[in-house]
């Protein structure tokens, strides 16, 4: 099926996730299939939890030619202290140019499914700062996670959080985050 789908110019990769335990990194079939993505210049989107982020780094090490997009800031909970597995993996991600962070899922990380997730960048800065520091302006992309995000905050709030945060980084960084990086990746 991968050969059939990858023949279409709009097919850019696959998204996978939903593991209760670790990623199947040591399974030969899984490794073979991941290598096929890299061979076809396709990306792997990972929908994983904060505790699984170190495994995304291991994939990046094993497959340096594969673009790996980590979805929803790796579903890190919006509370301090941040999980050590997440903070260590964010620091390690700096060394892997094939790892990309989709900055989304922030309001969901608050757990406030009654629509009252906080607005503005300030409540999320302790998550956004280490991500921006590790991934830089070239390896982050915007994601809304709409319509799921609507349970936690209106779309305007979701957009406003990252717009406020990235606006202070300059027009070029903001343009890369919202548009150009996604077009390039």
Predicted regions and their residues:
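Catalytic alpha-helical scaffold of carbohydrate-active enzymes acting on polysaccharides/glycoconjugates
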Residues: 1-9, 29
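Catalytic pocket-lining loop regions of alpha/beta-barrel enzymes
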Residues: 12, 23-141
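Glycine-rich phosphate-binding "P-loop"
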Residues: 8-25, 147
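Conserved, mostly hydrophobic/aromatic
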Residues: 5, 37, 72, 101, ...
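A generic structural motif
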Residues: 18, 71-74, 177
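Mid-to-C-terminal alpha-helical segments outside catalytic/metal-binding sites
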Residues: 129-130, 134-141, 150-185
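Short Gly/Pro-enriched loop/turn and capping motifs at secondary-structure junctions
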Residues: 106-108, 146-149
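Structured loop/turn residues at beta-strand edges in well-structured enzyme cores
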Residues: 9, 95, 172
């Amino acid at each position: 099926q991968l050969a059939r789908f990858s023949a279409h110019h709009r097919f850019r990769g696959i998204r996978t996730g939903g593991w209760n335990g670790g990623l199947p990194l040591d399974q030969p079939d899984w490794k073979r299939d991941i290598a096929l993505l890299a061979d076809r210049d396709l990306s792997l989107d990972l929908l994983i939890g904060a505790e699984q982020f170190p495994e995304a780094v291991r994939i990046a090490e094993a497959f340096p030619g594969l673009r790996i997009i980590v979805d929803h800031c790796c579903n890190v909970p919006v509370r301090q202290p941040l999980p050590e597995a997440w903070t260590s993996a964010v620091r390690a991600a700096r060394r892997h140019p094939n790892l990309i962070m989709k900055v989304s899922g922030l309001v969901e990380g608050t757990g406030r499914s009654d629509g009252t997730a906080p607005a503005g960048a300030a409540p999320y800065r302790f998550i956004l700062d280490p991500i921006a520091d590790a991934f830089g302006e070239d390896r982050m992309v915007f994601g809304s996670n709409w319509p799921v995000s609507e349970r936690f905050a209106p779309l305007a709030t979701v957009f406003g959080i990252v717009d406020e945060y990235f606006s202070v980084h300059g027009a070029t960084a903001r343009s890369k985050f919202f548009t150009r990086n996604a077009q390039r990746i």
